[in-house]
Regions:
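Non-catalytic, conserved peripheral segments adjacent to functional cores
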Residues: 1-100, 106-109, 113-117, 123-145
Length: 145
């Protein structure tokens, strides 16, 4: 049986500063200046976890792989408005299997209630992710609040 704990172990994930679990799985060898052209991670949120509000200085593509659906909230401005996109498998019901978040957009994610107890996605960042380009908002902050 696939559980969050099993996937965390099998995928060799580590705690992520924004919440959840991750592991970088790819970084493009080509570089633009001192930065890779793109990078990718596995990212897993357990049912009780969330990806806290943060922004990245690069475009980010979220790709849903398994588990429960995920609500991805995002805003181009710290003043709002906040938009929500549901990532998941049921495209007929309106789920999106992937979504692009623009560079410098505020974003947050939370698994939706379901039977699996986790959500597994990949995040592809271009140009490649650097922690120096990552900003984590204060606890309980949200755009427009």
């Amino acid at each position: 049986m696939r559980t969050a704990k099993t996937l965390i172990e099998e995928l060799r994930l580590s705690p992520h500063p924004e919440g959840g679990w991750y592991r970088e799985v790819w970084r493009a060898p080509e570089e633009e200046g001192e930065r890779a052209l793109a990078s990718a991670i596995y990212f897993l949120l357990e049912a009780h976890q969330r990806s806290h509000w943060h922004k990245v200085d690069a475009a980010e593509i979220w790709l849903w792989h398994g588990g429960d659906p995920l609500m991805l909230s995002h805003s181009v401005s710290p003043r709002g408005p906040v938009r929500e996109v549901r990532l998941g498998p049921d495209v007929i019901a309106g789920d999106q299997p992937q979504v692009v978040i623009g560079a410098h957009e505020w974003q947050s994610a939370v698994p939706l209630p379901g039977t699996e107890g986790y959500t597994l996605v990949s995040c592809v960042v271009t140009p490649g992710f650097k922690f120096s380009g990552f900003t984590l908002a204060p606890p309980d902050w949200r755009p427009g609040a």
